[in-house]
Amino acid sequence: MKIGAALEFNLIDYPGKIAAVAFTPGCNYLCPHCHAAPLLANAKDIGDEGFFKYLDTARDWVNGVVICGGEPTLQPELVPFIERVRERNLSVKLDTNGSHPDVLARLLEAKLVDYVAMDVKGPRFLWPATAGGEGHEENMTESLKLVSRFPDYEFRTTVAPVIRGGGEINFITVHEMAAAAKLIAAATGRSDHKYFVQKFVPRKDGLLDRRLETFPETPPQLLADVHKEVSKHLPNTQIRG
C-alpha cells in the first residue's frame, strides 16, 4: 500500500492506544481547511515494508495502528495492508471521509478494523463548499450508517471557515452545525454517537486554500455555542482542540 508519511509513536490519534500512524497519499476531496495538502497529490510513496519492519521492532510498546490520509479507502491495497497489521495482533483505527462505503462494508464484514473516525463535512447542503466538490452525498450518507456498526467509532466535524458564494469567508454557523448533527441522527436512526466538534487551527505551511492561512482559529465562544446546540441532537457531543 502507498504510504506518503508515517509516525512511529502517537498518543493522541487512537484513544487508549500507543499507535504508529500511516498517512496514505491522495484524496478525492478538496477541503479548503485541510491540513494535509502535501499528501493530496498522491505522488510521494515511502512504501510499506519499512513501516512493517518498524512494527516488528516496536512490539513492546506499540499496540495500535492508525491509517489516515489523504483518504485511505482510495488505496487498492488497503485490505491486505490491514490484514498484515492484524497478523501482528495490533488494533486498527481508520480515518475516512466516508466517500467509499463499499470499502467500509468490506472491512466491517471481515472484522478488520476496531475503530473508525469519519469526518462529517457539515450539513449536506454545505458539502460542495466544505468538501470542495459534489457527487459524494449518497455515499457519505450510507457511510454514516456503516460506521455506526463498527466496534468503536466517532463522527467529527471541524468548526472551520467556509468559503461561500462571492468569496466571502466565515465560520460554519451554529445552525449549520446543528443541521449536521440532525443528519447523523437521521441517517443512523440513533443519537447516542460520539461526536466531536473540532477547533480549526490555521497554519502557514499546508492548508489547501491559502486564504485560510491567516484566518483566526475557531473562537472558544463559537465552540461553546455549537456544543450547546448540537448536544440537543447528539447528547454525547464533545469539544476537541
Regions found by a protein language model. Give the residues of each.
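Canonical Radical SAM [4Fe-4S] cluster-binding loop centered on the CxxxCxxC motif
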Residues: 5, 9, 14-49
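Class I S-adenosyl-L-methionine
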Residues: 7, 19-20, 215, 233-234, ...
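Extreme N-terminal starter segment of soluble prokaryotic enzymes
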Residues: 1-3
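Glycine-rich phosphate-binding "P-loop"
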Residues: 36-43, 63-71
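Conserved AdoMet/S-adenosylmethionine-binding subsite of the radical SAM
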Residues: 55-64, 73-215, 220
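Charged phosphate-binding loop/patch that engages nucleotide di/tri-phosphates or the phosphate backbone
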Residues: 219-241
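Conserved beta-strand termini and adjacent loop/short-helix elements that scaffold enzyme active sites
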Residues: 6, 198-200, 239-241
